Amino acid sequence: MTFRIEKDTMGEVQVPADKYWAAQTERSRNNFKIGPEASMPKEIIEAFGYLKKAAAYANHDLGVLPVEKRDLIAQACDEILANKLDDQFPLVIWQTGSGTQSNMNLNEVISNRAHVLNGGKLGEKSIIHPNDDVNKSQSSNDTYPTAMHIAAYKKVVEVTIPCVERLQKTLAQKADAFKDVVKIGRTHLMDATPLTLGQEFSAYAAQLDFGLRALKNTLPHLAQLALGGTAVGTGLNTPKGYDVKVADYIAKFTGLPFITAENKFEALATHDAVVETHGALKQLAVSLYKIANDIRLLASGPRSGIGEILIPENEPGSSIMPGKVNPTQCEAMTMVCAQVLGNDTTISFAGTQGHFQLNVFKPVMAANFLQSAQLLADACVSFDEHCAVGIEPNFPRIKKQLDDSLMLVTALNTHIGYENAAKIAKTAHKNGTTLKEEAINLGLVTAEQFDEWVRPEDMVGSLK
């Protein structure tokens, strides 16, 4: 490998000759060999591409950056957004907690690439300075949180929400399709009064509907950008009106409703917006875990479990037991949910680390957030495609378990009283007989009365 010499305020550094990054990026590569290289999320790099381009335009509009430099910076940023420079961002999550080295990685790459675009060569002094031009009116302290918000907002709106909505729609369709399938209910994992399979699935659809609403309700806070606060939130070294103008450009370039933060001190020192939105992702994970767990239990069997629903058989389930098929989509979903719950713990703790004017756990918050948002999206699509759409009732099993249930006796409460109804249920359970047999044997009802009063289809109410 050949090298060139780059300089920063601490001296000279050898840098791979064919790479656009410079001294500070190389120092970070050497100082933080923690985990796989280039673990900084690609979404963060993309977000920096938007904000650096927006900053160049805002600085030009406000008279502090020449148009020639604006256009060269913007051209380099467009290449980042077009994925043409993906191999130029080698840094890891585990670096300074402000994300300073990643900010400088972007500054250096944009600076050197702009110089080459202008006809220069790597190793020459660039006509675009990484700090004075690319980072003009900025600090790592306001750029990295801005990149966090851009990346998180885009991921949630463009990826997570549509994928969860897809699964929610399928579950709502199943609720309607199963509205007349009467089955036994269960509370405390024990038999309870009847409901319809449609009512059961309507709860799942409603859970995701509420989760989506909660997620969308967090977006206005996440749309507020720290850019313009610079080092501690005061806006030092920015031209008047820069914060509003740069947010407007980011909104224009992304097509999303970003605005400047109401309070820059809050935007730098805390990341409550990220904690808040990830809390809604956690809510969805809690709901999805319950849904997937219920479905795998309802499908358990095929002969010795509950077996009230049939789910698609996608692959062999055992290397030793021939013919075994497992609820693999449910297991994958519940593992994803466990990961999201763990990520929420990390993000919540990281959110507490806003010491005075700066939170210094930014990269780990960003990485965990983006992983959660993507995993939930992928898991919802997989679960929908390979499980939910293929769920069907197992009618014989549903009927048998409904007929065998002792909790149908609840319908007799208003006719013979709770204590007499309990006596029928306990006697039938003890003797292994039916409710009807014991109700008649005990002389508490006639056969005709039992048939009239104990009708599962009349016990499910009118609620959908």
UniProtKB/Swiss-Prot annotation:
Site feature (Important for catalytic activity) residues: E331
Any GO MF annotation of the entry: fumarate hydratase activity
Keyword check for Lyase: yes
Main location: cytoplasm
Entries under Gene3D superfamilies matching the protein: Fumarase/aspartase (C-terminal domain), Fumarase/aspartase (Central domain), Fumarase/aspartase (N-terminal domain)
Top enzyme category: lyase
Alphabetized HAMAP family for the sequence: FumaraseC (MF_00743)
Protein name (record): Fumarate hydratase class II
Organism encoding this protein: Pasteurella multocida (strain Pm70)
Primary gene name: fumC
